[in-house]
């Protein structure tokens, strides 16, 4: 499958899009994408995911009403990612003491997503 086919499948809701990291950037992305695509919103923080499922936006970026209305599938279960073909990694990249980015979360999220990639999958990094 090529990128054009994947885009068509996403639009037809035959393939799923996953947003990995549901903080200030990832949560509003997931909510907006879910207006047009089947979206898996993944975060390793189970308490945060439970709040999102209850319609409570702990980031203040998307809003409680948007969370209550969204079709986004919020989860902290890694195995849910096996159903995705398009991934957006949106995890923190804080600065180290020497003003270089700390890529620990990016590397961990990359390894997590890599376990669920299939031929033709697409990964986008949003930082």
Give the positions of each predicted feature.
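Structural/interface elements that position substrates and couple domains in central-metabolism enzymes
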Residues: 1-127
